[in-house]
C-alpha cells in the first residue's frame, strides 16, 4: 500500500503542547483513501528539523509528504502555497539558535511551490464547513524551513513525490484562560481537516 507521511513538530515557544504533533499522531496508522498514514515529529531546531524529515522520507518512502505546523494567531487551516529560501527567526529555536537573514539552502532557488493541490484542498475544507484558505506565506521560522528543505530534497532526489505544508491554529487548551485572548480550533476539527486534505491528495495521485 502506498504511504503518505504526515509530520508535526514538538512544542516550542513556551507552549506545553503542539497541536500539529497531536493531530498527526491521531491519524498515524490509519488508511485514508487508499493511503497508509505514517507520521513523525520534528524538532524545532534549525537544520535538524530538515534532517529528521529527510530520515522519515527515506525510511517510509511515501508517495506524498504533508508537513503540519502550529501558527498561533491564525484562525483557520492555512494551506501553504510557497516556501521561501529564508531563515529569520523572531524567537530562538529549542536549542537557543536565533538565525537572522540566512538562506535555508545556500545557493538554492528563491522559492518552491507546493506540489499538492493547494487550492483544491482549501476549497474542499470550506465545502465541509472547516475554516481554511490558501496562504502565501509560511513565515521564516522552522515551519518554512522544513517546507523549503523537504521541497529541495524531493525535487533533487524524489521528484515524483508530492509535498506541501499546512499551518493550524492553537487548540482550545492553549487558548482557555489566555491573556490576551487567543484564536483556537478544536483538535478534532483540525484532525478532520487533515483527513480531508489527505483524501484530496490521494485523488490527485490517482489521475
Swiss-Prot record:
Localization, per the record, is:
Cytoplasm
Catalytic residues (positions): 80, 143, 167
Q: Name one GO cellular component term.
A: cytosol
**Mostly located where?**
cytoplasm
Q: Which UniProt keywords apply?
A: Cytoplasm, Hydrolase, Protease, Thiol protease
Q: What is its EC number?
A: 3.4.19.3
Catalysis: reaction(s): Release of an N-terminal pyroglutamyl group from a polypeptide, the second amino acid generally not being Pro
Superkingdom of the source species: Bacteria
Pfam families to which the protein is assigned, alphabetical = Peptidase_C15
Please give the biological process terms from Gene Ontology that the record holds: proteolysis
An example of a GO molecular function for this protein is: pyroglutamyl-peptidase activity
Q: Kindly report, in one word, the top-level EC class recorded for this enzyme.
A: hydrolase
Annotated InterPro entries: Peptidase_C15, Peptidase_C15-like, Peptidase_C15-like_sf, PGP-I_bact-type, PGPEP1_Glu_AS
Q: Main role? A: Removes 5-oxoproline from various penultimate amino acid residues except L-proline.
Q: How does it assemble?
A: Homotetramer.
Q: NCBIfam families given for it?
A: PRK13197.1 (NF009676), pyro_pdase (TIGR00504)
> Which family does the similarity line name?
Belongs to the peptidase C15 family.
Can you name this protein? Answer: Pyrrolidone-carboxylate peptidase
Q: Which organism is it from?
A: Coprothermobacter proteolyticus (strain ATCC 35245 / DSM 5265 / OCM 4 / BT)
Amino acid at each position: 500500500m502506498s504511504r503518505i507521511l504526515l509530520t508535526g513538530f514538538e512544542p516550542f515557544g513556551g507552549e506545553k503542547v503542539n497541536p500539529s504533533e497531536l493531530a498527526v499522531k491521531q491519524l498515524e496508522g490509519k488508511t485514508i483513501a487508499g493511503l497508509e498514514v505514517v507520521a513523525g515529529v520534528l524538532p524545532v531546531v534549525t537544520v535538524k528539523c530538515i534532517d529528521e524529515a529527510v530520515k522519515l522520507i527515506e525510511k517510509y518512502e511515501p508517495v506524498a509528504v504533508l508537513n503540519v505546523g502550529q501558527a498561533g494567531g491564525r484562525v483557520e487551516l492555512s494551506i501553504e502555497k510557497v516556501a521561501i529560501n529564508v531563515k529569520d527567526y523572531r524567537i530562538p529555536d529549542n536549542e537557543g539558535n536565533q538565525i537572522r537573514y540566512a538562506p535555508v539552502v545556500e545557493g538554492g532557488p528563491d522559492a518552491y511551490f507546493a506540489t499538492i493541490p493547494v487550492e483544491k484542498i482549501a476549497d474542499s475544507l470550506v465545502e465541509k464547513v472547516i475554516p481554511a484558505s490558501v496562504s502565501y506565506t509560511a513565515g521564516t521560522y522552522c515551519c518554512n524551513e522544513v517546507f523549503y528543505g523537504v521541497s529541495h530534497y524531493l525535487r533533487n532526489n524524489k521528484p515524483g513525490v508530492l509535498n506541501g505544508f499546512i499551518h493550524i491554529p492553537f487548540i482550545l487548551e492553549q487558548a482557555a484562560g489566555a491573556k490576551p485572548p487567543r484564536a483556537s480550533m478544536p483538535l478534532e476539527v483540525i484532525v478532520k481537516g487533515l483527513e480531508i486534505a489527505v483524501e484530496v491528495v490521494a485523488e490527485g495521485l490517482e489521475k
